[in-house]
From Swiss-Prot:
Disulfide bonds: none
Protein name: Cyclin-Y-like protein 2
Gene encoding the protein: CCNYL2
GO molecular function: protein kinase binding
Transcription regulation recorded as keyword: no
Domain of life: Eukaryota
Residues in Cyclin N-terminal domain copies: 204-286
The organism of origin for this protein: Macaca fascicularis
PANTHER family recorded: CYCLIN Y, ISOFORM A (PTHR14248)
Pfam family, one: Cyclin
CDD domains in UniProt: CYCLIN_CCNY_like
């Protein structure tokens, strides 16, 4: 009215997040048997993070990025944390280089080939593929690689800096008394693998959660300026898996469900572990696609350097048809997502119709 102009802006509705109810399948007896001689572990649980308020002014569209779409600013120095910036080298890969170089020197001196004679390579006539991709990593190989990264964190640690919340001597996971001698020796890779594998089997997590857990672990080590050592590695790994499962799982996750997998841990203690872990990483639970990919490929490099290889299969006609089917499914997902958001164009339809299959 008069000389006053008003304008109402109707922002786009933010996409709804579907929450599916579910429960963790407890498998307590397997947890207690996890590490044959090593201490038994616990299971992860996560915390609810209240969404921050989003304010906007007239003329500005409301666009809220999903947590996995948040990219770090470009002005971050390259020497920053690898869990935040994809151009920074991962800590575990740097720590593993000392052992890798020593193995290569030893093999060169003894004239031992580091290549496996049974390893198969692709050619013009035959193509060998493994079942591990960045979007769907091979579970067993990913767990072996992630636990190997944790092993190098422990073995090549600078000191024994730790915090009370992660100290297993102050917060034991079992009721059995543990001798002080146990904490004087670094755990072997196989013990770490059994511990993590048992947790993933009990919680029914996929390989992606292992990679995200490792990202959280390196973020904790960098932010809190601590080391992973024999006294704290189990509770640190537990906290990371717990957080990853609650942040990224489509299923409803409750701390009470995880407590059923332990002999000597209460809901209050689990809540405190989760709370302190979040606080120490500055509540930075976001993982960008570029950081995730960097960790995935560095884990593959780590596995290759240590003689760990995923099983490979010959690309035959049946497997090619399966790959085509998966490709079609992804195309349809993009198609329906675009149609739902009202951004579908005639060009999108043409590209979808012209999608080619794998030919022989």
């Amino acid at each position: 009215m008069g000389n006053i102009m008003t304008c109402c802006v109707c922002p786009r509705a933010s996409p709804e997040l579907d929450q599916h109810q579910g429960s963790v399948c407890p498998c307590g007896s397997e947890i207690y048997k996890a590490a044959a001689g090593d201490m038994i572990a616990g299971v992860p649980v996560a915390a609810a993070v209240e969404p921050g308020e989003v304010t906007f002014e007239a003329g500005e569209g409301l666009h809220v990025h999903h947590i996995c779409e948040r990219e770090m600013p470009e002005d971050i120095p390259l020497e920053s944390n690898s869990s935040d910036h994809p151009k920074a080298s991962t800590i575990f890969l740097r720590k593993s280089q000392t052992d890798v170089q020593e193995k290569r020197k030893s093999n060169y001196t003894k004239h031992v080939s580091t290549e496996r004679f049974t390893q198969q390579y692709s050619s013009c006539s035959t193509i060998f593929l493994d079942d591990s991709t960045a979007s769907q990593p091979h579970l067993t190989m990913t767990l072996k690689s992630v636990t190997l990264a944790i092993y190098y964190h422990i073995k090549q640690r600078d000191a024994d800096r730790s915090l009370g919340i992660f100290d297993e001597r102050l917060h034991p996971l079992t009721r059995e008394e543990v001798l002080e001698e146990y904490f004087k020796y670094d755990p072997e890779h196989k013990f770490i693998f059994r511990f993590v594998r048992t947790l993933f089997k009990a919680i029914r997590l996929t390989a992606e959660f292992a990679i995200v857990s490792l990202i959280y672990i390196e973020r904790l080590v960098s932010y809190a300026d601590i080391d992973i050592c024999p006294t704290n590695w189990k509770r640190i790994v537990l906290g990371a898996i717990l957080l990853a499962s609650k942040v990224w799982s489509d299923m409803a996750v409750w701390n009470e469900d995880y407590c059923k997998l332990f002999e000597n841990i209460t809901v209050e203690e689990m809540n405190e572990l989760e709370r302190q872990f979040l606080k120490l990483i500055n509540y930075n639970i976001g993982v960008t696609g570029s950081v995730y990919s960097r960790f995935y490929f560095d884990l593959r490099s780590l596995a290759h350097d240590n003689g760990l290889y995923s099983p490979v299969y010959l690309l035959d006609r049946e497997r090619a048809w399966k790959l085509e089917a998966f490709s079609r499914m992804e195309q349809y997902k993009v198609f329906y997502s675009a149609a739902k958001n009202g951004s579908l164009s005639a060009e999108d339809l043409i590209h979808l119709q012209r999608a080619k299959a794998i030919l022989f």
